[in-house]
């Protein structure tokens, strides 16, 4: 069974319309998550929502404990993750209000742990294709059906201190 994890970016702190909605704290060996997680069901789909910046936007991008968030999603059985971000564009053909279903990212953040691996465990994880094509196609189709201006494929860059 698919369990959809949704990571909300700036301005998205809860999901309206969830049935059987309940906020729960998830503990991880990587420390505290951004906030409690919201569990529920949306149109028959089990959903687990995490407000990435915390409710009330209390965590800056470089202070978010991404490892704890991802580990917690895994611990509660999430199989797919949809991560939403608000950001600007450097392209005139993608003005404010347009959606981009990204297929690649550049992470230039620093001053935070970036890996689950460390002393005693070395691993190499390919980031050549960091997104799920099946999920990207589904999101793109839903956005088009809802008449949102959307582009399939693009890059997102993070460079927060």
Q: Model-predicted segments: where are they?
A:
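Conserved small/polar residues in nucleotide/adenosyl-binding loops
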Residues: 159-161
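Metabolite-binding pocket within alpha/beta catalytic cores that recognizes anionic/polar moieties
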Residues: 1-127
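Polybasic "coupling" helices that flank or enter modular domains
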Residues: 128-133
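Short, structured loop/turn "capping" segments at alpha-beta junctions
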Residues: 146-154
């Amino acid at each position: 069974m698919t369990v959809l994890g949704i990571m909300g970016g700036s301005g998205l702190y809860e999901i309206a319309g969830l049935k059987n909605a309940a906020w729960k704290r998830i503990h991880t060996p990587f420390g505290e998550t951004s906030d409690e997680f919201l569990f529920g069901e949306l149109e028959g789909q089990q959903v687990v929502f995490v407000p990435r910046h915390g409710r009330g936007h209390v965590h800056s991008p470089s202070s978010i404990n991404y490892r704890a968030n991802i580990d917690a999603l895994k611990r509660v059985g999430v199989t797919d993750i949809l991560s939403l971000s608000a950001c600007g564009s450097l392209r005139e053909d993608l003005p404010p209000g347009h959606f981009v279903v990204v297929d690649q990212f550049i992470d230039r953040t620093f001053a935070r742990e970036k890996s689950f691996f460390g002393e005693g465990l070395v691993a190499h994880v390919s980031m050549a294709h960091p997104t799920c094509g099946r999920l990207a196609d589904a999101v793109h189709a839903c956005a088009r059906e809802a008449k949102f201006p959307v582009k399939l494929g693009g890059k997102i860059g993070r460079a927060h201190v």
